Each structure stands twice: as C-alpha cells, then as structure tokens.
C-alpha cells in the first residue's frame, strides 16, 4: 500500500473540484441509451470504447515516443488489466446484471462503490482512522437507502432480480473497486507521466480491447437494420460520450486520484449518481420526489463530512 502524501488546502479544493467535474461528465453516460434507443448496450459500449481509443490515440500521439521511453513492460501490463477492470469487464458485468436482474437492483448494488472504495482506502498507510470516516459513511449509506427505497417503490416491489443478475452486479462492484484503488495507487508512484497522459494511455489500451467487442456487437448481432441517419446519430453520441465522459471525465478523475487521499476520492464517486439523477430529472421533465431530494442531500453531506475530516 502506498503512503498518501499530505494534501494542502489548495490541492484539496482542486482535487475535489476535479472529482465533482468528473462526476458531472460521467453522469452523461446514462443519457446515451435514451438518445439512440435502437442500438444495443453492447453496441453502445463497443462504439464508445472504440471512439475513446481513437480520440485518446490522437491526443497522446505528440508524446508517444517520450512515453514509450518512460514506460516499461510492467506499466503496459498494468494499463491492460486496468482497462479491462475499469471499462470492458465492468461494463459487461453491468449489462448482464441489468439483463438478468433489472436496472433497479443493479443501480442499488453499484451505488455501494463510494463505500467500498472508501473502506479500502482507509487501510492505506497514513490514511485517517475509520472512526473519523464513520459519519461520512453513514450519511452515504443513508442516501443510498433512500435511492433504493425510491427505486423499489417505483418498481412496485418487483426489483428482486435473479441470483445470476445479483452475482453480475456484485462482480461489477468488485471490478470497479479494484480499478479505482489500483489506479490511484499506480498514479501515486508514476514518475514522468501525468495523470492526463495515463488516462489517454488507458484509452488507447481500452480501444484496442474494444476491437474484440466490435465483432459480436456489430458483425454477429441479429438486430434491427439502421439507416444512414441513425448510424450518423449513433456515431455522434458515442464520440461525444468518448470525449466528455472518457477523455475529460477520466482525466479529471485521475487528477483527483493523484491529489487526494483514496478514502476521500471514494466518496467523490457519488457525484456520478448525483449528476445522473439531475440529468434524468431534466430529461423526464419532472421534479425530484422527497426521497430523491433527501438522497441527494445525504450523499453530498457524506462528501462534505469526509472532506472536513481530511482538513483537520
């Protein structure tokens, strides 16, 4: 486990701001299926990650030779499995969980990410003791409970899901927890490579891996035929998601991960849920319910509590 360097007040503010902005971009991912409803989740995933790889390759090209000299076989191997854990495997688990157990159950399980990352981060050398993080964890858990209750009520109690679906959701939770923790620890020990460059290299690796998804997604799919206008819209959506959610969002997240203690970074993941909810309210043209407002307030309160604990 790496030792977390002391975080100055300025670094704390900049890191938290980067984490919040990352969440605002990541929240847009949940609107993509609404914009191109005729395409499957596998096609959206393959398209997004292929676009991510192309954009990342173009942006990292000027620094490619220097990075090749800086990175050894160990770093490239790490990039490969981080790309699998944080992107490819994570999404495949989520897609199968939604298919087998329903979106409500999946969202509730994935919503535990802030808690799992924070708990793992609390074991790092130099991290705050868990008792000082207890208030933020309790606030986050209460917020997630509100979301779960609201989701179950909206689904009229039919959100139990099958055992395979629950297992896949748990797999997604483990996959992204491993990614968040390992990525943060690697960023802390990297020398001569910026957080943004590491994000772009992850994109290049993810794009290469997405080629394997493209075959079943586009060549073997038995789906509806799409016209030129639909494909053009699809291309626009996946490239927008790649640029804003993957390149900008992941770059900002890596900056936060490199600047902040892992326990605090874990709490910032809630902003993906918060912004996704706000975008959903705007898309559905409705006001949040009382439980939804309570959930958002509790989730933000958990982050504020965690940040305050790290200032003391």
Regions found by a protein language model. Name each.
Residues 14-22, 66-93, 164-172, 225-248, ...:
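Loop-to-transmembrane-helix transition segments
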Residues 23, 47, 87, 104-112, ...:
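Helix-helix packing/entry segments at the starts of transmembrane helices
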Residues 56, 60, 129-154, 290-309:
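Hydrophobic transmembrane alpha-helices of multi-pass small-molecule transport proteins
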Residues 59-63, 113-138, 274-293:
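C-terminal transmembrane-helix exit sites in multi-pass transporters
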